[in-house]
Amino acid sequence: MKKTERHCRIFKFEAEFSDNLRCLPMAVRRKLDLCGRKLRLQHWLELGYEQKMELLNWGDSELELHKLADRLKESCSEINRAIQEEWQQIDRVPGLIEEACLASKQPVPNLRQWQQLDELERFALLKLCSPGHSHSNSKSRGNLPLALREFLENKIT
């Protein structure tokens, strides 16, 4: 996979809704966090498939994220831009990941594995574990083992 394609992919664990994009893919959620916009699920559902694909394929460079924030300022509420979030850090495995893995009887990624994940993969794992997040329900916690397997399958231990 080319580095430029990493920002717009849909993970295998998201396959249940990837055909019609009925839920926001992690790639879109990450870009929204990076540009400081909150898109409600109801608004996402009102978008056409082409509009959803446009957001999915939108670049994640600083310039592209600025353009995305401008484009969405009328339809999305503003939130703090993601800066120095745990998924942007590679110096330690976040405690939330450790807790969620232990609770779901999954092996905890070691530091080397965490460092080998790209930013979108780290973002997805943390969103799947985050309390109070729409992905932290039991069904999404069920996606945690799938995501871990998908992301860590070819990583050096």
Which stretches of residues belong to each language-model region?
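Glycine-rich, aromatic-bearing surface loops/beta-hairpins
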Residues: 126-157
